């Protein structure tokens, strides 16, 4: 295999000074993107077998595209977006949180904290919020470079990155006081600490102590796209999807989540809106790929009749009814048209009405 010259590699990794934003697979700033890391055996090929293959989506991609190489690469959307973490961070603020953090500063898996994973990275003009499902990710800022954890290669994962102006981070930081994240690395100094007191509270491990136990806020991206953030704390005491989200969005939901944990909640059709557990995922085209939900650690849901799509960090199980976490939703046509066809089959309710056929393929 031919190697890249140092000059070419430097050009590929170049990030403009003062431009903290999500970067797409093409290397250009984007308002938002979604990366769907595929399960290791989802399709043939060396990259696929090693669990480093992914699909990429943004506003201009025209649907899902094959990722630009390996998800472990610093030149792809994830690596390029997170690159400032592993360079000079003197002018930045950041927060890395994960209920299963990398081994750093003695951090341990903490089941009393929120089941929530993400990155906030910002400068004086704005930055991005990355919400994901990946354990042990990303590496702390003291690491030599971006990398993908070997522990996250086997199963599917989802990550959504949205670029926001600085003004939106006050609402974002307040949402984190509900989700009670395990922060394993951060930098919050000077003006950032003064502008975002909620982030200081989050870093100290503080969280909401009185009702309401959930919060929904509208966030506006740098390009003006509208996102709805849903956050709950453990005292909410109910499933995020059937206990709140379906009613809030006014729609049935098909939910993909990790189905190898204990206490899985079955599909729920007790309310006006039905919440159905996805059992099979299939990407379009003859090459697929397609796989079972038991091979997929991602967390997302889609409304089959209305253009809502949400990507987050919570499962549907009994334990997580009593843990913090959330999801980020939008009515973006590009997002909905990409996610809706992924649902190949779902678990029906025991007495489900026939609006959805038992375990049947999704209808066009």
From Swiss-Prot:
Record: active site: 297
UniProtKB keywords: Apoptosis, Developmental protein, Disulfide bond, Endonuclease, Glycoprotein, Hydrolase, Lysosome, Nuclease, Signal
Catalyzed reactions per annotation: Endonucleolytic cleavage to nucleoside 3'-phosphates and 3'-phosphooligonucleotide end-products
InterPro entries membership: DNase_II
GO CC terms of this entry: lysosome
Subcellular location, record wording: Lysosome
Ranges that cross the membrane: none
Short name of one Pfam family: DNase_II
Statement: the UniProt record of this protein carries the keyword Glycoprotein: yes
Primary enzyme class: hydrolase
GO molecular function terms listed in the Swiss-Prot or TrEMBL record: deoxyribonuclease II activity
Glycosylation, residue list: 72, 88, 171, 214, 268, 292
Disulfide bonds: 22-161, 269-349, 310-329
Leader peptide range in chain numbering: 1-21
Biological process annotations from GO: apoptotic DNA fragmentation
EC number: 3.1.22.1
Family per similarity comment: Belongs to the DNase II family.
PANTHER family: DEOXYRIBONUCLEASE II, DEOXYRIBONUCLEASE-2-ALPHA
Function according to Swiss-Prot or TrEMBL: Hydrolyzes DNA under acidic conditions with a preference for double-stranded DNA. Plays a major role in the clearance of nucleic acids generated through apoptosis, hence preventing autoinflammation. Necessary for proper fetal development and for definitive erythropoiesis in fetal liver and bone marrow, where it degrades nuclear DNA expelled from erythroid precursor cells.
Protein name: Deoxyribonuclease-2-alpha
Organism: Sus scrofa
């Amino acid at each position: 295999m031919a190697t890249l010259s140092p000059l070419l590699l430097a050009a590929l990794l170049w990030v403009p000074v003062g431009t903290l934003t999500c970067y797409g697979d093409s290397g250009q700033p984007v308002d938002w993107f979604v990366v769907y890391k595929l399960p290791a055996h989802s399709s043939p090929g060396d990259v696929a077998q090693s669990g480093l293959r992914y699909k990429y989506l943004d506003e201009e991609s025209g649907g899902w595209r094959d990722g630009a190489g390996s998800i472990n690469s610093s030149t792809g959307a994830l690596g390029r977006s997170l690159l400032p973490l592993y360079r000079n961070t003197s002018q930045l603020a950041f927060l890395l949180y994960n209920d299963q953090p990398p081994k750093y500063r003695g951090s341990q898996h903490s089941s009393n904290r929120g089941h929530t994973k993400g990155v906030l990275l910002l400068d004086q003009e704005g930055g991005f919020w990355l919400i994901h499902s990946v354990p042990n990710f990303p590496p702390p800022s003291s690491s030599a470079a971006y990398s993908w954890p070997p522990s996250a290669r086997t199963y599917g994962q989802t990550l959504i990155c949205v670029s926001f102006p600085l003004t939106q981070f006050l609402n974002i930081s307040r949402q984190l006081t509900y989700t009670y994240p395990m922060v394993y690395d951060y930098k919050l100094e000077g003006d950032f600490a003064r502008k975002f007191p909620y982030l200081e509270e989050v870093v100290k491990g503080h969280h909401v102590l009185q009702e309401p136990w959930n919060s929904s806020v509208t966030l506006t991206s740098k390009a003006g796209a509208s996102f709805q953030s849903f956050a709950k704390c453990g005292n909410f005491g109910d499933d995020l999807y059937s206990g709140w989200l379906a009613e809030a969005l006014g729609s049935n939901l098909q939910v993909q989540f990790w189905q190898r944990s204990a206490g899985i909640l079955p599909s729920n059709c007790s309310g006006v809106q039905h919440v159905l557990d996805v059992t099979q995922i299939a990407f379009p085209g003859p090459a697929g790929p397609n796989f079972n939900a038991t091979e997929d650690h991602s967390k997302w849901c889609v409304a089959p009749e209305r253009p809502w799509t949400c990507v987050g960090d919570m499962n549907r199980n009994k334990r997580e009814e009593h843990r913090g976490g959330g999801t980020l939703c939008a009515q973006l046509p590009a997002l909905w048209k990409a996610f809706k066809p992924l649902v190949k089959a779902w678990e029906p309710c025991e007495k489900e009405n026939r609006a959805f056929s038992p375990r049947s393929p999704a209808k066009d």
